[in-house]
Structures are given as C-alpha cells and as structure tokens.
Amino acid sequence: MQTQHFDAIVIGAGLGGLLCAAHLLERNKRVAILERLPHCGGRFTAKTFQGAQISTGAVHMLPFGSSGVLAHTLRRLHIPHRICDADVFGSFHVHGTQVRARGLLGVYNVFGPRQFFWFLRLGYQMFFRRLPAAQRALPFDTWLARHIDTARNAELVAFFASIARFALSLELHQVRTDEVIRTTRHMLRFGAPGIVQGGCGALTGQLEQQVRQRGAHLLLHTEVLQILHNAGQATGVRVRNKASGEQSMLDAPLVVSDIGPRATGALLHNRQVTQAEVLTQHCAQLPEALGLKVHLLSDISLIPHKGIMYCLDTRRIAGIVQPTNADPRLAPASKHLLISHQVIQSTDLAEERALALADLHTLFGESFTRHCR
C-alpha cells in the first residue's frame, strides 16, 4: 500500500477545512486536504439550478458581516471577497405581520411595552452581571425560565428560539447559556450577518484556488476510512479513492478533522458514519445541528431588506433570507431568491418539508401561491 508523508492532513474541504489548510500553508507546512465529494465547499458552496444559486448548507451569509472574525480571517489570508452588510438588525414575523427593526431597540414594536421591559431586564442580566460558574453550562431555556415567566412572554421566548434555530440549527434546550450570551455579545459588537457577493460558492472557490496555488495536495473524491493513532497521538489516515477503489496511507503528525465530532470519533475506531445514522440517532452529549432549507424563486420581492426575517409564529421555519436584495446575480433576471431555514425535529423529512411549505403559505398567503416556485 502506497504511503505519502505530510506535515498536516485536513479531513473535509468545506469552509472550515479550507481555512485551516490556508493557515497551515501560510506557515510553510506540507498539507494534504481530503474530500469525499468531487468538489470543495461542503456546506458552504452552491449549485446552479434553473439559473439560481442553490446553497448546499449556508444561506449565502457570513456571520457578523464584514466586521466579524471570519471576515477578518479572510482579509488576513488575502482571500478576495466582498460582503454586503445587513441594513437592519432584522425583521420579525409575529401575529401575521412582518415588523422591521433597524436596530436592537426596534424590537419594541415586536414585543410591546411589557415584554420589552423583560427584554431589557434580560439584557441587563446577560451583559452587565457576571454569569455564575454553575449557570454557564445550563441549557438556555432553563436559564430563561428562571428569569422570566415564559408562559406570559411567548414572543420573547420565540425571539430567542428563532435566532438559535436559524444561527445554530439547535433548540434552546440544546444550547448552553454562556454560548448564547457570547453569541449575542458578538452580534451587538460586530453586527448582523452579511451576504457574500457571488454567494457562498464564490468564496470557497477563491479559497480553493488559494490553497492550490500555495501547494496544497488536494484529493477530491477521496474517502477517509480510518484515522491512525498511537498512544493518543494521531499518525495519519487510511484513505480510498472512490473512483478506482485503491487504498493508500497518508502519514502526518497533525490530523485536523472538519467533518463533525460523531464522524471523527467513528474514524478513530475504524468505521464510518452514514447520513442515515445522523438523521435517526440522537446523541444527548453531542447535539448535532440538523437543518432543512427551502429555496424559492419569486416574481416579487417578499422581504424588503438585506437581513434576516425571523419567524416567531410558525411551526417550523425559523427565518428567511432574500439574498438577491444584495446580489441579484444569485437568481435569474427579474427573479428574487428566498431561502428559509428550520431545525429538523423528526426523522420524517417529507413531513418536515410539508410543514415548511405550510409555514410559507401562512407567512406570504396569496403571494406565495401566485408568485413563488
């Protein structure tokens, strides 16, 4: 069996894997990048379908826009990119109406005076009082219930739930309180997510070009069968070329896995995790982010801004983006691309999709029926 030697091996050529490889190459390391698919990008790329850029996972947005850590990293690595920052904090669909909030205090019109008072009180608790160590790992829904009457503040609870679902693909009981507080602080410091010009595929395309030019050994359509290790130290990987079936060994003192904790753990024990297992098995210790997106093409604009419309009165959909407000090239001429996102709450994907379509009917009514496909 053929063996190749590297300074570092990166498993997964998604956004995280490509960024990791770019950092290692900047340090003059010999890097191998392994990807089971025939293309890079993972959940941060897109396919063209009927003239629209259909994203594989992301919604053509970068966390915290041009001010965020990711944008700063791209600039430091000299990756060409353009980000169109949101022109609002967000809008909120509640009680059958879309309420636009230019800034954070604009949510007053979402909550009304009583719930807005509790919103401000929560803000004080989260940002001006030190979180006790015993509460840091507390599920956020539990922490929330200790500070407000959740039954009387339904919209306030839905506000946090929709943001957690859209941003993390997790429910409030799956998110630690310190993580919610940290993420919210970052949102206030850096701003809302921004839309990537050209879509997420354009960004990972630039990253792929960069790592290739810097000498990365990029192996596409290559399946990692096992992460090799000895005495607690990674030593390399065993891989298989999916086209030829040929197996080979790659040695390196550093192995970086960007395919998730469950799949990585399986490879350490010489097995692979299938997508079916991810959907049907539940791991309480390591909650996985499982989301479903619906892409729509509309003849008319349904969201009047470049941010996220969070949905507080739906059964499944957490939020919707209309990225063509920032880059019309993401859809055919005179069309608007909308992307909804929801947390998968069952193993029945057909039911999840049906509930998403029902939510879209509720949100947009006759406009959805007449103008969307």
Go through the PLM ranges and name each one.
Residues 88-181:
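Rossmann-like flavin
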Residues 45-54, 64-120:
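A conserved beta-strand/loop capping segment in the N-terminal third of enzymes
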Residues 225-336, 343-347:
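Mid-domain catalytic core of redox enzymes
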Residues 25-50:
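Glycine-rich FAD pyrophosphate-binding loop
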Residues 323, 329-373:
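Conserved flavin/dinucleotide-binding core of flavoenzymes
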